[in-house]
């Protein structure tokens, strides 16, 4: 199946996106696409100080030449992140109140408005957003458009994330990184000439974000096995069937070669379409992304700089590859189910553990809340482990067919220019190890560490990673 056929198939299962235009020079078609999707509407181009000169200013001129009434708003920040105040800022941009939007943008101590209070009637929308940028700007436009009961167009400037086409926006609210429900854009425009010229570190981040779908897929297989989150066939096949091919040219990605960049961007976009089909981020992330959430929520910095999503995910992905390497060394046909069930804590004990682990975290109740959602009683654990013991050889074989080894993934990241050691983003290996209890508990989503806790082999798959000769030897 070629790219055009894959994209057509993906659009057929997409619930929100109807147009995906990718190729060299296609940004010039954006006004035409806008008119097809939003006839007679006003366009409001949202860019930042980096993407405005790269493409935003030219698009603004093209829209006006096409007879489309057009405004623009440029976020005057060298660095900014997907924080709630910028959602509120973008809400005001949709309504044409640029003065109030600028006040929020420049406010050092903005008081966050409760999410449910930001929904507006569609008639309050002044125009339709055209997002010109990468992950953060796209997520801001996605959620603000949803607040106003309308869609938007996303014009990508880098192959840095899978969020362009994903269902939901990842935003920090109340100190916690959360995924807010909102539809993906109705149209995505990806000009490979623009995207291939993006800073190399952004492209490397996108490569790591796409590679994270390898361990995320394996963890979804485990969740499917336990019955907690069954695999959605369309969402699985539209991405996983081609993932190896999309990751096959890390050298071309590093060199900015057009075909390698096009393959990378297509893979990232299909990942988003998978999330649309599943109405969940399950097809694209699991523990690998939770390391990134921890770093975001604790404002981890390296040389004074917050690290990109993809860079953080790179280290989470490598760590989970190492966990699976250790998992495959276990003979779970020898599991003592009775002993594991006897050792399994009560809900109250797990809630207490969650409160203790997250005691000094920016969201201290997060572990308590999430472990409560996914806790299984002893009967459930017995049934799960009994099946695991009986079917481990088959499950192990399927997981091995999905996974990359730590060594293979590290080599791919090295060649693509992505971080391949925690030190590359300013983390010590001890700090990374300390994150694992948080990762296991901080999301209701069933993960491989949950399986290890229930089967009493958590230490066997974690400790060797940080021991002498381990992947992250301390």
PLM region spans:
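Solvent-exposed alpha-helices and their adjacent loops that cap or buttress functional pockets
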Residues: 12-13, 37-38, 119-124, 145, ...
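A glycine/threonine-rich phosphate-anchoring loop and its flanking beta-alpha core
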Residues: 143-245
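ATP/NTP phosphate-donor binding region
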Residues: 1-128
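A conserved active-site cap/scaffold subdomain adjacent to cofactor or substrate pockets
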Residues: 240-330
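C-terminal charged capping/lid subdomain of soluble metabolic enzymes
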Residues: 2-7, 330-474
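Short glycine/serine/threonine-rich phosphate/pyrophosphate-binding segments
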Residues: 54-55, 134-143, 161-164
């Amino acid at each position: 199946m070629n790219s055009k056929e894959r994209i057509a198939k993906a659009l057929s299962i997409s619930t929100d996106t109807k147009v995906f235009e990718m190729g060299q020079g296609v940004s010039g078609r954006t006004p035409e696409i806008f008119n097809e999707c939003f006839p007679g509407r006003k366009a409001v181009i949202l860019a930042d100080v980096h993407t405005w000169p790269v493409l935003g200013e030219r698009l603004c001129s093209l829209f006006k030449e096409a007879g489309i009434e057009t405004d623009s708003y440029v976020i005057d920040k060298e660095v900014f992140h997907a924080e709630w105040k910028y959602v509120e800022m973008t809400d005001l941009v949709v309504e044409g109140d640029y003065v109030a939007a600028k006040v929020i943008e420049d406010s050092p101590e903005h008081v966050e408005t409760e999410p449910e209070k930001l929904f507006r009637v569609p008639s309050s929308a002044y125009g339709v957003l055209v997002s010109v940028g990468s992950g953060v700007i796209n997520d801001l436009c996605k959620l603000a458009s949803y607040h106003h009961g309308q869609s938007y167009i996303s014009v990508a400037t880098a192959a840095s994330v899978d969020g362009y086409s994903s269902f939901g926006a990842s935003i920090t609210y109340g100190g916690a990184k959360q995924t807010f429900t909102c539809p993906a854009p109705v149209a995505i425009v990806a000009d490979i000439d623009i995207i291939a010229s993006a800073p190399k570190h952004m492209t490397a981040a996108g490569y790591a974000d796409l590679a994270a779908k390898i361990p995320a897929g394996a963890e979804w297989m485990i969740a499917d096995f336990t019955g907690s989150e069954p695999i959605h066939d369309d969402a699985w096949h539209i991405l996983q069937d081609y993932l190896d091919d999309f990751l096959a040219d890390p050298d071309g990605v590093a060199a900015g070669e057009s075909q390698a960049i096009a393959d990378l961007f297509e893979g990232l976009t299909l990942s988003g379409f998978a999330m649309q089909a599943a109405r969940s981020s399950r097809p694209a992330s699991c523990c690998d992304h939770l390391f990134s959430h921890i770093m975001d929520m604790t404002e981890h910095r390296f040389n004074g700089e917050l690290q990109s999503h993809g860079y953080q995910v790179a280290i989470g992905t490598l760590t989970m590859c190492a966990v699976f390497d250790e998992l495959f060394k276990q003979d779970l046909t020898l599991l003592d189910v009775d002993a594991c069930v006897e050792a399994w804590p009560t809900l109250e004990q797990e809630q207490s553990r969650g409160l203790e682990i997250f005691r000094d975290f920016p969201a201290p109740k997060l572990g308590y809340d999430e472990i409560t959602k996914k806790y299984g009683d002893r009967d459930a654990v017995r049934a799960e482990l009994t099946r695991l013991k009986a079917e481990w050889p088959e499950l192990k074989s399927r997981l091995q067919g999905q996974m990359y080894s730590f060594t293979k993934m590290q080599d791919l990241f090295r060649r693509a220019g992505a971080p391949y050691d925690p030190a590359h983003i300013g983390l010590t290996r001890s700090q990374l190890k300390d994150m694992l209890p948080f990762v296991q508990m901080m999301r209701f989503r069933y993960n491989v560490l949950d399986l290890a806790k229930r089967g009493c082999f958590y230490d066997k798959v974690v400790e060797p990673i940080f021991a002498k000769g381990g992947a992250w030897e301390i």
